[in-house]
Amino acid sequence: MTSNRVGDAVLSTGLLDYLLEQYPTATATVACGPSVVSLFRPCNRVDKVVALQKMRYAGHWVRLWTQSVGTFWNIVVDLRASALSWAIPHARHFIFKSTNEPVHRVVSLGKVLGLSEPPAPRVWLDEADAVRARQLVPDGPVLALGPTANWGGKQWPASSFLELAKRLTQPGAALAGARVAVFGADGERGMAEPLLAGLPTDQSIDLIGRTDLPLAAACLDRCRLFVGNDSGLMHLAAAAGVPTLGLFGPSPEQHYRPWGAHTGFVRTPESFEQIVNAKDYDYRSQQSRMTSLAVEPVVAATEDLISRIELPA
């Protein structure tokens, strides 16, 4: 049982991958939020994905119980700390317990199974997604941008993304002449529109609302680099093995920075604590808390990331 949120669900894929490696003849059932069901579709050892569509009076848990109680489960992994894992027949179960430890979420998830090596997130791709990705993202250098987020407070201004794209793709830059692929969900077009409008039409690749999660991962796999807000898309890019730079403001990078050797992050001059403890902070507001992050440090962080890795040709 994993998250409703794309980012947390992506980060949990390492646990599933570990269990499937440890038990090579086993299959898995995954219960998750509707928005992340497609993430598990390409994994041929996941035989069922149950969408936990929230219902009144915890009806979604009752429905999941009726779908689960008739099976004896060898292992139950409950990352939502629900009562359900106690109410279905099982041999062993493992429950995630949230703590305030200053460690990455992947490390915390690994502790659920007592793992000394954190289970790196991964994505599963199938050939159909790879074929479609080749149609959507052309050969040659492509810079991927993720200008959206599930909350306005975490969004770096679209105008800053536009300036970043120009800086990184100008003559003599690290990605000189690259196309720019803009990713986001269908309902996020308004957030990305100023960026798309500012890019030359022969340079931009508009992928807003055109992909599910596996296809987005396949498209990202064809990009040289991803730069984006702290979001599920950022974690998807990192899990797909794409060099990934995450942008942080009102979220704690020690817990949610992109995971992997070819990743990095840059944050606002203000720390997470300074932002959320400010007198004018309101978590209900959609106002960006990322405006103090200038383009220059993001360019510098991108160049630093590129210098640490060898970008594919």
Q: Which stretches of residues belong to each language-model region?
A:
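Catalytic machinery of carbohydrate-active enzymes
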Residues: 1-313
